[in-house]
């Protein structure tokens, strides 16, 4: 935990990000082939710009990011390509999100167990920096303001059935 991240007992435990400079770093990097990132979140503010939530950053070219993009929609971004969710994220509301990408580049975003976006993303650059939760230390002003109680990384592209199963396993905890 770095800077403005606090732990709360709310909903059986959650990380609370201040939206200023707080983030969590993990040595766990995304696979360069198949992967999924799953997390539960509650955003405290709407954004007119970008709030980075999860991702591997790179000193060289490229990055892999999952964020809240302009107009408060989820986005999966890899090396200049992106897919954007259709659902507008409301403040003060809990959501379960899953981002997937398979080795052929097919990417999907699931929100509360339902597919919210699909498309093709470029290849993943091998990470030379840490996986970050709650912010992007290579850019300024892109910090998450809200709560993230659960974050999981998989070395496979979860199926629609698996994304729904994981949502169903968490929905009562967060009133989804």
Language model features: what each stretch is:
Residues 79-80, 102, 110-113:
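Short strand-turn-strand beta-turns centered on an Asx-Gly dipeptide
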Residues 1-32, 73, 127-129, 168:
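Low-complexity, glycine/proline/serine-rich flexible segments
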Residues 17-75, 101-107, 141-142, 153-164:
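Extracellular glycan-recognition modules
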Residues 77-84, 127-149, 153:
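Extracellular glycan-interaction patches encoded by glycine-rich segments
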Residues 73-96:
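Short, aromatic/His-centered strand-loop micro-motif at the edge of beta-sheets
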Residues 87, 111-131:
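Short, solvent-exposed beta-strand-to-loop segments that form ligand-recognition rims
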Residues 25-28, 84-89, 120-122:
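Beta-strand-rich interaction surfaces with strong enrichment in secreted/lumenal proteins
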